[in-house]
Amino acid sequence: MIPPLSSLVRYDNPVLVSTSKDKGKGAKGTPGKKGALPPVEQKPGLTQTEDILNSILPPREWTEDGQLWVQYVSSTPATRLDVINLQEKLDQQLQQRQARETGICPIREELYAQTFDELIRQVTINCAERGLLLLRVRDEMRMTIAAYQTLYESAVAFGIRKALQTEQGKSEMESRITQLEGDVKDLERQVQEWKFKCEAIEKRESERREVEAKKHKDEVAYLENYAKQLKQQLETFLVPAKKGAPGAPAAAT
């Protein structure tokens, strides 16, 4: 027989039920369902306690070689020594399984859940009503943890989506930056080309102005020289005419 995994909850010895998957309880009666809890009726204390225990902590079942084995939770009351041993086993399991002391740790959560189940078992044997109340506390804690776990998973998924979106946006932005940098370089090249063209045009215009100025200066000099020559010719022409003009007074003898 292969024993089930060890647990901090105290169980009785395994019982062979049948060679088929028949979930009868055998000598101890039919195990209670996991859903609804049995009402607290005026029954013999041992039977009522076992029914409640089986409802709170369902029996463990496994099959080996076609044989169905069932292991029920123990209905033996716990002593002070049992509680001390439970604490020692808890500390030992936490150390052996390397449970984290802080933060989210499934191993630590599992071991503390088993410890709480064992405490519920011990309390239920002494007082069924207190056991059922602790069961409600346990279920409420589990629902709260499940809600926080769902919220945490949703937050993680949201964070991953945002990270992927940011990464995608980053890639697009980097591509856009590369494109804009290329455009800037192209514009700088065009500016440089136009700058060279402007310098060439200014140089040509400067040379043209110099040529025009020199040409204009030469023309002015030529015209001044020509006017001077004409003036001299006119003066030369007018002087003899004045000397031989009729009616001019005779020179004194």
From Swiss-Prot:
Coiled-coil stretches noted in the UniProt entry, renumbered to this chain: 160-239
Disulphide connectivity of cysteines: none
Electron transport among keywords: no
Primary location recorded for the protein, binned into one broad class: cytoplasm
Pfam families assigned to the protein according to its UniProt record, in alphabetical order: Ax_dynein_light
A cellular component term, taken from the record's GO annotations: motile cilium
Keywords: Cell projection, Cilium, Cilium biogenesis/degradation, Coiled coil, Cytoplasm, Cytoskeleton, Dynein, Flagellum, Motor protein
Region (Disordered): 19-44
Intracellular or extracellular location(s): Cytoplasm, Cytoskeleton, Flagellum axoneme
GO biological process terms on file: cilium movement involved in cell motility; inner dynein arm assembly
UniProt superkingdom: Eukaryota
UniProt keyword annotation of Cell cycle present: no
A GO molecular function held by the record: dynein heavy chain binding
InterPro entries tied to this protein: Axonemal_dynein_light_chain (IPR019347)
PANTHER family: AXONEMAL DYNEIN LIGHT INTERMEDIATE POLYPEPTIDE 1 (PTHR13183:SF0), AXONEMAL INNER ARM DYNEIN LIGHT CHAIN 28 (PTHR13183)
Described purpose of this protein according to its UniProt entry: Plays a dynamic role in flagellar motility. May be necessary for stable assembly of a subset of inner dynein arms or for the binding of these arms to the outer doublet microtubules of the axoneme.
Family, per entry: Belongs to the inner dynein arm light chain family.
Protein name (database record): 28 kDa inner dynein arm light chain, axonemal
